[in-house]
Regions:
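Acidic, polar low-complexity linker/tail segments
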Residues: 2-39
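A short beta-strand motif characteristic of beta-propeller blades
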Residues: 40-42, 77-93, 128-133, 166-170
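Signature of short aromatic-glycine-proline-rich micro-motifs recurring in repeat-based ectodomains
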Residues: 43-50, 93-103, 136-139
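Residue-level detector of Asp-centered blade-edge/turn motifs that repeat once per structural unit
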Residues: 52-54, 104-107, 143-146
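Conserved beta-propeller blade signature
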Residues: 57-61, 108-111, 147-150
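Short loop/turn segments immediately following the C-termini of beta-strands
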Residues: 63, 114, 153
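A short loop-to-beta-strand structural motif that recurs across blades of beta-propeller domains
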Residues: 66-70, 117-120, 155-158
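Short loop/turn segments that connect beta-strands within beta-propeller blades
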Residues: 72-76, 123-127, 161-165
Length: 170
């Protein structure tokens, strides 16, 4: 019923070495470009939101690791000089805790932090968080005509004039 011998199949046609027996689980690509583990220190686990700045750099919010990472346009790699070893987690009212939405506008990163119940702003040049606002289960951000619109569950919202840095009452 059981045999101690194992047998290998030949490499699929077109691989160039069809006469050498081998055990192949899956062949994705020969260049090795797919060997990066996305849950390693330089990868992502459950990326939820992404935004690009004017230089083409991309900021990705990962809700499992509660952080935001920056990928540089030139290399496509995580920029380890961004925030703390390449990941912004923040603290206090500017903590990135399940970042549900990210927007980049005029050198600032705006984040809707779902379980922190905050929308906050980080200066991308200095890394300082200089504004935050309570929104229960902050979820969505939109920016148009220098006006920030942020919403959460249960009718929570904030509208902010980014030119004057003041909230607008409706």
């Amino acid at each position: 019923l059981f045999s101690g011998s194992s047998y290998a199949k030949n490499i699929p046609p077109g691989s160039g070495i069809g006469d050498v027996p081998a055990n192949i689980l899956i062949l994705l690509d020969k260049s090795g470009s797919m060997s990066v583990r996305m849950t390693s220190g330089s990868g992502f686990m459950y990326p939820y939101s992404a935004a690009a700045d004017s230089s083409g750099d991309v900021y990705v919010g990962s809700y499992w690791t509660y952080g935001i990472k920056k990928l540089t346009y030139a290399t496509g790699a995580v920029d380890t000089s961004f925030a703390s070893s390449g990941t912004y987690t923040g603290s206090g009212n500017c903590r990135s805790y399940y970042p549900m939405n990210i927007k980049i506008h005029n050198g600032y990163m705006y984040v809707a932090s779902y379980y922190q119940h905050r929308v906050f702003r980080v200066n991308l040049s200095t890394g300082a968080c200089d504004w935050n606002h309570y929104i229960r289960y902050a979820r969505n951000i939109a920016i148009g005509n220098n006006i920030l619109y942020a919403t959460g569950y249960y009718g929570n919202a904030v509208i902010r004039n980014l030119s004057t840095n003041s909230n607008i009452s409706c």
